[in-house]
Amino acid sequence: MNALDEHPSAVPQGVTLLRRHAVAFFILGLLNNMMYVVILTAALEILPSHVPTGILAFVNIAPAVVSKALFPYYFKGEIWYGWRVWACTLGSFCGMMCIAFFPGLFLRLVGIGIASFASGLGEITFLQYATRYPHQVTTYCIGWFASGTGAAGLIGASAWWIVRPLGVRGGLGLLSLLSFGTALSFFVILPLPSIMSRSTDETTEALMQDSDREPERNLSLSFSDKVQLLKPMLIPYIMPLICVYFAEYTINQGVAPTLLFTVPDSKQHKLLSMIIHSLRDYYPLYQLVYQAFVFISRSYTSILP
């Protein structure tokens, strides 16, 4: 149940603001993760035939992990969200353009790393920004952001299928323009936290009220302080999630590329023969099916009842 379900009598202004939050965070999650999926799905076209896809998979995720570990724990003080959003937008665009227009393996891996770092920075930035809203609005935004990251898999894999005939240069060059949708969504569609706090309508206030919320205080935590906060969550929450994601990505990126079958005959498998024309078509198809179910699993708090 989301915030709209809990307060069906919300005034039009409050409903409109929440819908803008939903649309904005869905787009932010979608575009932030979409390039990662596009690169992964296009792995066989991006890399030379003699290079294993595991190299691309590593470069596509390692910089994102570094950015997620670096920024929350080592940087203190006020977050400049505007600068971060532009850094994510331009980083994603430049990374994709580097992959598209430089045929050399090294420069393509550099481009993949830049796009990956931008994606990791974007994820923590948008989740941190969601906490600037009242509590119930924060959970509402995070639910739609998660749904957007799930849709990124489905739409990203589908997008590569559509632009694949254009080749790496044309296809990735065209998709790189979508990166600017991140800035558009953040600066134009997403309401400012100050707009939410100025609302005085009693129904809208009920929508955002959190009776347990303490007055805001400016805190500057050191790295050791943040580690102390992390320790109680490590065993019961973080380690199980690490195991789940490790198994998931091992299967998806390590095992799936090795599962190949003969090209289907049009007489025996009419539907599959329309989709699969060569052995290289299997992996993108695996990604499309996989990402479809990722979207379903990440939408149970927002879109799905």
Model-based region annotation:
Residues 18, 22, 35-41, 51, ...:
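Membrane-interfacial loop- and helix-cap regions that link adjacent transmembrane helices
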Residues 168-221, 225-228:
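Central mid-sequence intracellular linker of multi-pass
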Residues 63-85, 163-164, 290, 294-305:
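Helix-to-loop junctions at the C-terminal end of transmembrane segments
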Residues 82-98, 106:
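Structural signature of the two symmetry-related core transmembrane helices
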Residues 1-31:
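Cytosolic juxtamembrane N-terminal segment immediately preceding the first transmembrane helix
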Residues 57-65, 134-186, 287-294:
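Glycine-rich segments within core transmembrane alpha-helices of 12-TM secondary carriers
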Residues 38-42, 112-135, 255, 259:
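Intracellular juxtamembrane helix-capping segments at the cytosolic ends
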Residues 26, 95-96, 103-122:
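Hydrophobic core of transmembrane alpha-helices in multi-pass small-molecule transporters
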